[in-house]
Amino acid sequence: MIEKVLIANRGEIALRVMKTCKTLGIKTVAVYSDEDVNSLHVKTADESYYIGEAAPAKSYLNQEKILEVMLSSGTDAIHPGYGFLSENDDFARLCEKNKINFIGPSADSMNLCGDKMRCKAAMLKADVPTVPGSPGIVDDAQQAEKIANEIGDDLAAIIVEP
């Protein structure tokens, strides 16, 4: 059972996660930058920790600083919210390595889905229906035209990289 969640986000996103946690009886930990020191999510959380300057790269994207807060606060799970670290497979892997539950997809899933061609290949292998399209990267206009003719009326767009 998760007892304490660090929400690695701010504003309305953090507040929404906190509301759900409180409904479930889970303690919440907020992180904040210089810009958010007086924000509602900081005041609403059970615990709040300063993580750096206003620039996201120096605060909300600072994986080591957030890990430090997770470990020192006794957090057993992290909710990344939306944006920031929510799609960062390296951060999800860092959480796994430190035995902290990452509330979201696994690092491997994020890594796979970050590459459209690998993701589509995995979906096809698992018999998941996909939209019609190329089987891989389209190298030239002739190949694009051939694929477009095969797709027919379902064609939305094919982009040929130079």
Task: Describe each model-derived feature in a short phrase.
Residues 1-148, 152-153:
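N-terminal beta-alpha lobe that positions the nucleotide/phosphoryl donor
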